[in-house]
């Protein structure tokens, strides 16, 4: 089915879709695809790309706070609430289009207490992170909001992370059992549909 859909698109349609894809996707009339809006981040819809105001959204607790609750049910409810806000439509002063996608949740591991984005990630525990991510994604999905779990993978350091990609080294066992486990759980249990990659270069030995 996916191949059939792609085969219906022209080269120019594919090129325009890829080249105009940050925080939105363009409409493609030939296949009836509507334009979409997507927003960052893990504490709800935000707009750090411009000075435009956002209306009708909530600033939710940071994921590290949600992780401290150990409560998947309340995290799922938060996902449902964000999904409801996405449906509302009049979020941006520039647009009536509701948000279709959400760049969240952040499900990397607290490898160090000095991690620059630990507040965006649930825990140092891979199982807890996976359970809560799956719950949040499931809640958002139930309202028609697709999510981009992030940052895949081993994105536990902000310093130098996007200057040609920091080199991250780990054993295969650590990668599988600790760092990839939350992403696996989010897909298998939460039915995640999207992913945001990290900039780092990953090596093992």
Predicted region positions:
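Glycoside hydrolase catalytic-domain context in secreted enzymes
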Residues: 1-205
